[in-house]
């Protein structure tokens, strides 16, 4: 099987539109990690993503009759832009079905390259179903974003370039994984020619379809998929791609949202370029691999796979990057509600930089303050800060990994609502598009009074809300069924310490 793919890769016609991207050393990251780190800069492609390779190679394999019918695909962005440009160069009509939640930068990217955009549904499965309907109705040829041998071969040209650009020692290549087209192509080429090189997939911990399939020994469908790294938000690994990955991918690492944000900053520090969340997975994976294995002196390559990110999402990335690096702690600290307490607390913090401070007067004998403090993962870790404050008589609750605190509570500190009774608190995610907030409130209905509400647009595909509902005790059993009818993911946060300390 590998030999067949290598032949396809060597004969792929990608360079009519794609460029050979540089393999660039990440000097600062290399020094920090004690390993030689290289970035394969696929964000420098004409469509700012590696996807142009597979899309163009697939189109070149179509017959004249198939090209005349026109092509269609479903995509949330990068494959769509790659196919639009490939079709334009080859003179083929391309229709791209995209979810209504697709970032505007990707929609405009498709239109500017000559693709016809059809916005349909709130998720990729809905867009996919509609694109297949167009295949039946219009006779279009469907171009799969990853699960096709010619697409896989096109993506495999990335590996061909890496081995040519770095013929010396190479210990591992870290590859972002969504549907698996990129890692399958890279694994096929590298394992045929240089089997000693490890191929390591990297996925978000809430979108790990390859890891789940490898563990099960077969393709599985994830019940839910996180969409922060929207470029790899895939519920099931492809069949063709898994056939390769099962035998030739050495391992899969998963990383958190905060770790992805930290990796985006790392890439920026070394290259002064901004990558999209999915594009930073390789670097995030290298950092975790080095930390967990304690390796040093190795040569490691990360595929920087794309840079199609909405500018307004960078606010969220900046907020979370220091947390992912272990350079900031988010804590709740209890101090006496009396003059001089603030000063005593600041003295206890010492020379550490305070990055965030939220407080509202409380009528009780104790005050709870929401604080961000700069830390250092090695010289002054979070654990040392918490231990120091506790020893000096300041009770601390660590909120660094608390999503409710990071997304909502930090913007809401304002005191307890003493006269609010029977309050239960839920966190929701819903598809982000114009009118989405109104639609969410409409679905929430009016059975129970809304006692608290916070929404913030993160420039992402999902809107995030925390809501307090006044539900009498004898009606609590009705809540799960009522929320299930809304149809959006939700989490019960009523017992969350951040809520209890600051708002409950």
Functional labels for PLM-detected ranges:
Residues 1-436, 440-504:
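PLP-dependent amino-acid enzyme catalytic core
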